């Protein structure tokens, strides 16, 4: 269990009001791992040293979270973690395995960086499962430990040699030029679109060319393909992007790059009217709590296009569904957060009061071509929050 405390000096850099993770070259990350090991060995050999479990991690608990609010209209708000620390203790039964996992993951990252390789979280899990099955019995152990290492070394996940496992795709009024000079015209692709690589190093080098006026983030692949099949971007100059569900890091990264390249191009989200849909929108908009040290690198000023409460009149009663226990859990978490803005909170409250949820596909009751018209009308009329 993490034990919160007042932050002391971290291994790398003075603690600040807003903690962050740095993008570092492999040699610097390996050097930080070496420093962590030397500090640990020094504590072992020094009889006057405090407990050897002094791993200065940043707490991801609710009390240590905050929202870096935008000061100007076009600025972006993002989730951040403050200075409160926590410990992984070798002497505490509940913490011992988590303590060992941190060193195991750092050892693996040191090796990966030395070989000049990149691995996914899934690949890392299976490697650790093979080498240390006692400590890594599920993917969650790896995911949480990687965030502990990010917290300890104050470097991004990509800097550790761990790349995103991307499901994302994009299509529309966009030409992408890769590092090898190849060009992809996303307006002439099939409805599956252009697959987004999980290598953030490659994504950071892409060159964009676009005459689009809008970016539309779509929760579901099926909706993305419907809009792509209808070629909505032919009459509504836009770029469509999807992570096919909960946003992965690579999709968030390329969306952020697009927002930086085209700062005057508004971003709209098309998600289901349920707590999970709102959670997805908030992840794009503010970043994720689990990656609080680097959330600001991927946050975008995303507007909620639909579905929203005002759209329920378009949906037949038979298309409504009851909220599920998982919906209620997500809603409770969102309502307790510090970043949920008033209009989003009102939508979530309406879901809970009615006990209902609705999916975007319910709009097909008006015909398959209605979805594109619905999206275009709401954008043109400024019907978003």
Swiss-Prot record:
**Which parts of the chain span the membrane according to its record?**
none
A Gene Ontology annotation in the biological process aspect, one of them, is: seed development
Query: Main site of residence?
Result: nucleus
Keyword Thylakoid found = no
Arranged from A to Z, the UniProt key words for this protein are: DNA-binding, Hydrolase, Isomerase, Magnesium, Metal-binding, Nucleus, Topoisomerase
> What is the main EC category here?
isomerase
Topo IIA-type catalytic domain boundaries = 24-169
Concerning its family, UniProt says: Belongs to the TOP6A family.
Functional note: Required for meiotic recombination. Mediates DNA cleavage that forms the double-strand breaks (DSB) that initiate meiotic recombination.
Its recorded name reads Meiotic recombination protein SPO11-2
- Species of origin reads Oryza sativa subsp. japonica
């Amino acid at each position: 269990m993490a034990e919160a405390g007042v932050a002391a000096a971290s291994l790398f850099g003075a603690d600040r009001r807003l903690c962050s993770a740095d993008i570092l070259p492999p040699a610097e990350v390996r050097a930080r791992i070496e420093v962590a090991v030397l500090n640990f060995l020094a504590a072992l050999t020094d009889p006057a040293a405090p407990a050897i479990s002094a791993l200065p991690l940043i707490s991801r608990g609710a009390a240590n979270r905050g929202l870096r609010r935008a000061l100007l209209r076009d600025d972006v708000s993002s989730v951040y973690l403050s200075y409160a620390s926590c410990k992984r203790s070798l002497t505490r039964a509940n913490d011992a395995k988590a303590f060992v996992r941190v060193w195991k993951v750092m050892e693996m990252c040191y090796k990966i960086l030395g070989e000049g390789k990149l691995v996914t979280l899934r690949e890392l899990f299976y490697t650790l499962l093979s080498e240390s099955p006692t400590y890594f019995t599920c993917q969650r152990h790896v995911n949480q430990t990687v965030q502990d290492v990010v917290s300890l070394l104050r470097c991004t996940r990509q800097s550790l040699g761990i790349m995103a496992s991307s499901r994302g795709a994009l299509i529309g009024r966009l030409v992408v030029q890769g590092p090898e000079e190849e060009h992809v015209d996303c307006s002439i692709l099939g409805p599956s679109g252009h697959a987004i690589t999980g290598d953030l190093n490659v994504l950071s080098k892409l060159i964009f060319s676009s005459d689009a006026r809008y970016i539309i983030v779509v929760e579901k692949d099926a909706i993305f393909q419907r809009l792509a099949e209808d070629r909505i971007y032919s009459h509504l100059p836009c770029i469509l992007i999807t992570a096919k569900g909960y946003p992965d890091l690579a999709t968030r990264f390329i969306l952020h790059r697009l927002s930086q390249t085209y700062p005057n191009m508004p971003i709209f989200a098309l998600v289901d009217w349920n707590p999970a849909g709102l959670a997805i929108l908030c992840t794009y908009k503010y970043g994720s709590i689990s990656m609080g040290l680097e959330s600001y690198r991927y946050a975008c000023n995303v507007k909620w296009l639909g579905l929203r409460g005002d759209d329920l009149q378009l949906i037949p009663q038979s298309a409504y569904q009851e909220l599920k226990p998982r919906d209620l859990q997500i809603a409770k978490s969102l309502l307790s957060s510090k970043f949920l803005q008033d209009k989003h909170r009102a939508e979530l409250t309406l879901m809970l009061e009615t006990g209902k949820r609705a999916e975007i596909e319910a709009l097909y009751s008006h015909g398959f071509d209605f979805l594109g018209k619905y999206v275009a009308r709401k954008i043109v009329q400024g019907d978003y929050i």
